[in-house]
């Protein structure tokens, strides 16, 4: 019944019936056998082409004698169909509805519109509003273009800066590697040059301490010697226990490069200070080896042979102190060693003639004058002794008491005297220039006898 109506409508197409394209399209969509390819949409107000390939291969040749899907879509557009779903091929028209074939006659083919007639229609009242919209769109596009151009310039500038920073970092990395190699090379060279001098100086100090063959005693504190030994040991610590190189940090930014450069600069300064300290130690060692006495602890024998002008505060051990009970034994032992030592020179006894010449008597004084002169000489000697004691300070009283009560002995044996002639000269001067207290008392008694003899001759 429906097909007959469609046929009647098609037969009367010349008298205002629906076009054949619309009739064939309606029959194709209405066929239930092809619903998997094309079918009505939800509600029957549209149709959907589910499989365009099968539609072009099977249905179009059957109904329209061609297989061009695009041509079929253009035909739909000429009859006023529109695509209502962008995700699929679904088309609709207000008069193309399922079960309402009588509405197909209301669908007409659009006539082609020429460009001249279209321009004439556009030049109406819609031209101003459309122009304003276009101008706004143009201005918006220009603004967006300017933003994009500025962003592009900024990106190019950042890229240039990044490339420059990368080149600078590569140059700094190469310079740091070269500086690190130079530091390692200079350190190796310094250790090779200075290691022998330091070891020899340490061996020499050990040799000096062993050659004395005297037990170590803390007689006095020598700050200068302690400072020099500390310098030597500090230099040895720098040479042998040098700090390890800092670990290589991952190069991520400029801060890591700055930290590495600071560490390299600190290492360079450290090695420079070590080199200066090593040079100073070498100069000190060369001066000490050339004749200067090394700054080591002085033994008790050197205290005896030290000259009076040095002003060194000498302190005796408890075993040799005059107040100790072993003073007599020590005096006997010192006297025996002094007489048996090869460098001993006995002080000659002064004859009466020389004693008379020392007094420088220009006239024969009276008994009162002699007594006053003896008293004045005694006071003068006491004043001189007090001035000497005051000049040397209270710390040298023990030394002078030992010097006046005990016989000094030489601290150097024959082999040491051959190696250090200066010490021999000091020992001989000490032995020949100092007299013990018994000799002084004897001279005083002789002076008393001389005074009495002069008094007798004068009377």
Swiss-Prot record:
| Lineage: superkingdom | Eukaryota
Localisation: Nucleus
Checking SMART domains in the record gives:
HSF
Q: Result of mutating residue 40 to C?
A: In spl7; lesion mimic phenotype
Task: Show where the record puts the motif AHA.
Answer: 397-406
Q: Does the keyword Nucleus apply?
A: yes
Q: Where is this region: Hydrophobic repeat HR-A/B?
A: 141-191
One Pfam family of this chain: HSF_DNA-bind
As for family, the record states: Belongs to the HSF family. Class A subfamily.
Free-text note regarding domains: The hydrophobic-rich region (HR-A/B) corresponds to the oligomerization domain. AHA motifs are transcriptional activator elements.
What's this protein's function?
Transcriptional regulator that specifically binds DNA of heat shock promoter elements (HSE).
Subunit organization = Homotrimer.
Query: Could you tell me what this protein is called?
Result: Heat stress transcription factor A-4d
Tell me the classification of the organism that encodes this protein: Eukaryota, Viridiplantae, Streptophyta, Embryophyta, Tracheophyta
């Amino acid at each position: 019944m429906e097909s007959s109506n469609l046929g009647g409508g098609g037969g009367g197409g010349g008298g205002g019936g629906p076009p054949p394209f619309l009739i064939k399209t309606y029959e194709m969509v209405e066929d239930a056998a092809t619903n998997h390819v094309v079918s009505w949409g939800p509600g029957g107000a549209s149709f959907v082409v589910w499989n365009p390939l099968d539609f072009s291969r099977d249905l179009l040749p059957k109904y329209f004698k061609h297989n061009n899907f695009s041509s079929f879509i253009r035909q739909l557009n000429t009859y006023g169909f529109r695509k209502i779903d962008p995700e699929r091929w679904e088309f609709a028209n207000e008069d193309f509805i399922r079960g309402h074939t009588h509405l197909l006659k209301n669908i007409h083919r659009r006539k082609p519109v020429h460009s001249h007639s279209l321009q004439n229609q556009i030049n109406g009242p819609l031209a101003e509003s459309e122009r304003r919209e276009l101008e706004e769109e143009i201005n918006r596009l220009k603004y967006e273009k300017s933003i994009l151009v500025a962003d592009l310039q900024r990106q190019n500038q950042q890229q240039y800066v990044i490339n420059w920073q990368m080149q600078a970092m590569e140059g700094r990395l190469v310079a740091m590697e070269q500086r690190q190699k130079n530091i390692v090379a200079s350190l190796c060279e310094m250790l090779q040059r200075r290691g022998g001098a330091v070891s020899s100086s340490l061996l020499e100090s050990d040799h000096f301490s062993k050659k004395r063959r005297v037990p170590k005693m803390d007689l006095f504190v020598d700050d200068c010697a302690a400072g020099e030994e500390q310098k030597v040991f500090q230099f040895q610590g720098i040479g042998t226990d040098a700090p390890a190189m800092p670990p290589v940090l991952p190069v991520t930014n400029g801060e890591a490069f700055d930290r590495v450069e600071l560490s390299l600069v600190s290492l360079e300064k450290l090695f420079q200070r070590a080199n200066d300290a090593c040079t100073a130690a070498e100069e000190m060692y060369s001066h000490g080896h050339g004749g200067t006495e090394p700054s080591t602890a002085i033994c008790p024998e050197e205290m005896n042979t030290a000259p009076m002008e040095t002003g060194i505060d000498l302190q005796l051990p408890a075993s040799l102190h005059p107040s100790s009970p072993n003073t007599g034994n020590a005096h006997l032992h010192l006297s025996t060693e002094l007489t048996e030592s090869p460098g001993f020179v006995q002080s000659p006894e002064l004859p009466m003639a020389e004693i008379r010449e020392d007094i420088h008597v220009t006239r024969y004084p009276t008994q009162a004058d002699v007594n006053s002169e003896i008293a004045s000489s005694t006071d003068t000697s006491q004043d001189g002794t007090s001035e000497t004691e005051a000049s040397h300070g209270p710390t040298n009283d023990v030394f002078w008491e030992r010097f006046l009560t005990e016989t000094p002995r030489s601290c150097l044996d024959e082999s040491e005297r051959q190696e250090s002639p200066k010490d021999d000269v000091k020992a001989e001067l000490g032995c020949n220039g100092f007299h013990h207290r018994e000799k002084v008392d004897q001279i005083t008694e002789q002076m008393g006898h001389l005074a009495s003899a002069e008094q007798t001759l004068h009377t």
